[in-house]
C-alpha cells in the first residue's frame, strides 16, 4: 500500500484532564485514492491529518509512506518530505495579499523540483482570466481555488485537505469539491480530506469514520 496508518493513538492533557482523541487508528490508502476522514468536531480528524503531514506526533503507532516511517525521519528529512510530497488545503485560504493570483500559485511551484505548469493549473481551476487580480478582488470560492492551485502546482503525491469548504456557502462548496475531485482524477493525486459533512462521502473511494 502507499500510505499505512498503523495503530495511531494520541492524547492531550494529563491526569484527570487527559483526553484520548485517537484510539488506535488503522487505515491503508492506495496511490490515487480519495479518502475522507469523517466525524464530528473533536473526533480527532484534524489531529490525524496533522500526524500524517508530520506536523504533530502520535503517542504510539506509526505512519508509513511508500514503506518509509515518518517517525524515523529527522527534522531535515521531515521538512523535505513535506516540501516534496505533500500539499495542504485549509479552511482559510492564507493567500499573500500583495501578490496576484498567478504569483500566489507560483509560490507553490518554487517549493517543487518537478512543478506542474502554472498556467495549466489556472485554466483547470477557472482562474486564468483572473490571474492578474489580487486576492481581495476575488470571491471566497475563487480564493479557495487559488489555494488549491498553490497546493497542487508543486505536483504533490498527497493532498491533505482540512475542511476546505468550511468557510464557503453550499453552492460554492460543491464547486470546490468538484475541483478537488478533478485534481484527484487528472493528476492521480492521493487525497485525504477531513470533513464533518456526510454528503462528501459519496465522492470518496474510501471513508473512515472517526
What are these regions (language model features)?
Residues 17, 70-87:
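ABC ATPase NBD coupling module
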Residues 53:
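Helix-to-loop junction immediately C-terminal to a conserved catalytic motif
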Residues 61-69:
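Conserved ABC transporter NBD signature motif
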Residues 99-106:
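Short coil-to-helix segment of the ABC ATPase nucleotide-binding domain corresponding to the Q-loop/switch region
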Residues 134-144:
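Conserved ABC ATPase signature
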Residues 153-157:
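A short, proline-enriched helix->beta-strand linker immediately N-terminal to the Walker B motif
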Residues 159-162:
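Catalytic Walker B motif of ABC-type/P-loop ATPase nucleotide-binding domains
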Amino acid at each position: 500500500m502507499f500510505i499505512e496508518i498503523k495503530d495511531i493513538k494520541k492524547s492531550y492533557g494529563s491526569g484527570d484532564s487527559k483526553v484520548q482523541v485517537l484510539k488506535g487508528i488503522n487505515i491503508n490508502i492506495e496511490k490515487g485514492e480519495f479518502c475522507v476522514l469523517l466525524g464530528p468536531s473533536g473526533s480527532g480528524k484534524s489531529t490525524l491529518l496533522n500526524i500524517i503531514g508530520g506536523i504533530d506526533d502520535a503517542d504510539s503507532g506509526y505512519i508509513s509512506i511508500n514503506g518509509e516511517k515518518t517517525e524515523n525521519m529527522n527534522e531535515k528529512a521531515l521538512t523535505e518530505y513535506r516540501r516534496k510530497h505533500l500539499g495542504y488545503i485549509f479552511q482559510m485560504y492564507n493567500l499573500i495579499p500583495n501578490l496576484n493570483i498567478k504569483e500566489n500559485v507560483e509560490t507553490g511551484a518554487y517549493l517543487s523540483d518537478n512543478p506542474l505548469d502554472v498556467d495549466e493549473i489556472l485554466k483547470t481551476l477557472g482562474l486564468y482570466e483572473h490571474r492578474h487580480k489580487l486576492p481581495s478582488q476575488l470571491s471566497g470560492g475563487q480564493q479557495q481555488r487559488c489555494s488549491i492551485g498553490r497546493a497542487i502546482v508543486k505536483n504533490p503525491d498527497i493532498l491533505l485537505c482540512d475542511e476546505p469548504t468550511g468557510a464557503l456557502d453550499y453552492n460554492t462548496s460543491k464547486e470546490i469539491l468538484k475541483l478537488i475531485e478533478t485534481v484527484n482524477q487528472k493528476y492521480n493525486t492521493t487525497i485525504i480530506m477531513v470533513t464533518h459533512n456526510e454528503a462528501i462521502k459519496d465522492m470518496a473511494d474510501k471513508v473512515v469514520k472517526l
